[in-house]
Design a protein with these regions (language model features):
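Generic, well-ordered alpha-helical scaffold segments in large soluble proteins
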Residues: 34-37, 136, 171, 196, ...
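N-terminal amphipathic alpha-helix/helix-capping segment at the start of soluble metabolic enzymes
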Residues: 1-21, 69-74
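Catalytic alpha/beta core domains of metabolic enzymes, predominantly
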Residues: 181-209
Length: 209
């Protein structure tokens, strides 16, 4: 879409259904059937296909998560729609720290599976947990989208977030995601933050999640 002479691209993210009740957790055969319908809609430049809880659900169904990711990303790759994954930085796809060599290998595997972008976040916005993953993703040929986890407090100011973004961009992240997980981001603050980042780094893509 074009608004005010700016191109706006939409990314389809429906990750939370993987973490909801069992009846909403899709099997790989269901994902493969829904992919053509998503493509036919013609409005998404990106689709989230794995990461976070995805692989865990595949395992619960007794499916091979590697085959599942390849099968789901393939139709999007074929038509030029970028695919992306969720990555918990130091914790990779888990809920606890993962060794550096395993995380480095994970990005190579994900790239081979057809995944283009990794959205890297740390709930504490700790750059030491995010920056290594940025470097591993770049080494593997993926696009690292570094994330700012949004909240509201006297500490979490525009300048605070802009400073974190500066560090992540300096580390090599070509994209920044404003991850408003709790839905408490204030429009005025988010607007000022976006403007500040774009003024400092005009070439950087910003996504709101």
């Amino acid at each position: 879409l074009t608004a005010m002479k700016k191109e706006i691209k939409f990314s389809l993210v429906y990750r939370d259904m993987w973490q909801s009740s069992g009846k909403y957790q899709p099997r790989v055969d269901q994902l493969v059937r829904i992919a053509p319908l998503i493509i036919e809609m013609g409005c998404f430049a990106r689709v989230e296909t794995n990461g976070g809880a995805f692989e865990q659900v595949n395992l619960l169904y007794g499916e091979n998560p590697n085959k599942a990711v390849r099968a789901f990303t393939k139709p999007f790759n074929e038509v030029g729609i970028q695919t992306h994954m969720l990555d918990r930085g130091l914790n990779a796809l888990r809920m606890y720290p993962v060794p550096a060599d395993v995380r480095r290998l994970m990005y190579r595997v994900k790239h081979a599976q057809g995944v283009d972008i990794t959205r890297i976040f740390c709930g504490l916005n700790e750059t030491r947990n995010i920056i290594p993953s940025i470097k591993y993703a770049l080494e593997a040929g993926m696009i690292p989208q570094a994330t700012l986890c949004i909240t509201h407090s006297p500490v979490h100011t525009v300048e605070y977030y802009a400073h974190v973004a500066d560090q992540l961009i300096e580390a090599g992240a070509p994209e920044i995601c404003l991850k408003d997980m709790a839905g408490i981001g204030r429009p005025g603050m988010l607007g000022r933050l976006t403007k500040t980042i774009k003024e400092r780094h005009p070439e950087v893509i910003i996504q709101y999640h």
